[in-house]
Regions:
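Active-site microenvironment of metallo-dependent hydrolases
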Residues: 2-115
Length: 115
């Protein structure tokens, strides 16, 4: 993603009623892994890398510079509010984001492609 909006993109799509959660998972997880031939990614399956994002639906929250979990520290979505929120993120099974805190000590693994 070229802009720092990935964490809010699913919120936007569900808020506007554009896609169901199942369709968002298909478009943001399954399809990229299939299209680009990324090995062992994009699905929750035995033997696959555990790249997961846990989201919750609840209280409204507003995007601002204090709660943007991005090194760039800005977002074109500042000032917008959402009910969906990323609570935890796992990369290769390692917890790298939890309740607003980023673990920047973990380095992911190189992607492998099946061409």
């Amino acid at each position: 993603c070229a802009l720092p909006i990935f964490s809010a993109s699913s919120s936007i799509l569900t808020k506007k009623g554009i896609f169901s959660i199942e369709t968002i998972v298909e478009k943001m997880c399954h399809a990229p892994a299939q299209i680009y031939g990324i090995c062992n990614r994009g699905y929750i399956r035995e033997g696959y890398q555990a790249d997961l994002v846990l989201v919750s639906h609840g209280e409204r929250w507003e995007v601002n510079t204090e709660n943007i979990p991005s090194k760039c520290g800005w977002s074109p979505l500042e000032g917008n509010s959402f009910r969906w929120k990323v609570e935890k993120t796992f990369a290769n099974g390692h917890l790298i984001y939890s309740d607003g805190q980023v673990d920047d000590t973990y380095r992911g693994e190189e992607l492998r492609f099946d061409y």
